[in-house]
């Protein structure tokens, strides 16, 4: 099974969350949006954190922003009123035909198609 992971899952993993670790282990094919890469790297406080992030990123297939993803993000933004980064990450999952795994219950709803709210902190 494959899934696109939202940034919050990776942040939790880097913080030592067992729930995040278990969630990542559920999926054989793990994908992330280039948006997640940007969000993680911007949040790194020092070179040690950057190295930890790069190590984690090496275990994911990173999906670039394509015209197809951009168009789907426009549809999502208009229909669901998500912020642009969230719309791009969700569009990435939809265009790949897989789940978006997140714990973002503020913007995402578990009853939306292709969304898995995996745990709560």
Which residue ranges define each predicted feature?
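Alpha-helix capping/helix-boundary segments
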Residues: 9-10, 36, 69, 88-89, ...
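Acidic, PIN/NYN-like endoribonuclease modules and their adjacent C-terminal/linker elements
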Residues: 17, 90, 94-121
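Acidic catalytic patch
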Residues: 58-79
């Amino acid at each position: 099974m494959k899934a696109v992971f939202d940034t919050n899952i990776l942040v939790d993993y880097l913080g030592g969350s067992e729930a995040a670790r278990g969630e990542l282990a559920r999926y054989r094919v793990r994908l992330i949006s280039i948006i997640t890469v940007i969000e993680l790297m911007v949040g790194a406080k020092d070179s040690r954190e950057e190295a930890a992030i790069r190590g984690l990123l090496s275990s994911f297939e990173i999906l670039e922003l394509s015209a197809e993803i951009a168009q789907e993000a426009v549809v999502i933004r208009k229909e669901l009123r998500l912020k642009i980064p969230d719309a791009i990450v969700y569009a990435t999952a939809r265009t790949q035909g897989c789940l978006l795994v997140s714990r973002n219950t503020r913007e995402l709803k578990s009853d939306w198609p292709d969304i898995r709210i995996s745990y709560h902190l």
